[in-house]
């Protein structure tokens, strides 16, 4: 049985869960006493961006904490959030744009493939656009690669899909 087995390493964000987390965070902001009369809001401004608006930097930090807690509750990784600079907005408010990271970029992909190749397992790792395809003849080797990647402290979330 010389069949090749494979799986893909991807870094994706479930946008439906992001929307759910934002809605839960907005519900908490509207109900919290310390945000009464505040202009605080969270909204998704495109596929890969979330805009946070608040009265001042202190309240913006509270909004960020609320959003992070809702991400955790919805099973989303905080590593997907890349926080931009805090900037002044209209009406005396402050704004911060959060970029949602998805896909494994070139440098990160090279780092992961090198890690897999250095493990001396009988598998091949190939970079395909923004994902990595790992192939091997033995399923046990692929499972060892999955375990190896899970043990690494990466600065981006990784999911394992298309196990064949």
From Swiss-Prot:
Gene Ontology, cellular component aspect: cytosol
UniProt GO MF annotations: nucleotide binding
Entry-linked Pfam families: DUF520 (PF04461)
InterPro entries the UniProt entry points to: DUF520, UPF0234-like_C, UPF0234_N, YajQ-like_sf
Keyword set, alphabetical order: Nucleotide-binding
Family annotation (NCBIfam families): PRK05412.1 (NF003819)
Protein role: Nucleotide-binding protein.
Family from the record: Belongs to the YajQ family.
The protein's name: Nucleotide-binding protein BH2387
Naturally occurring in which organism (per UniProt): Halalkalibacterium halodurans (strain ATCC BAA-125 / DSM 18197 / FERM 7344 / JCM 9153 / C-125) (Bacillus halodurans)
Record lineage: Bacteria, Bacillati, Bacillota, Bacilli, Bacillales
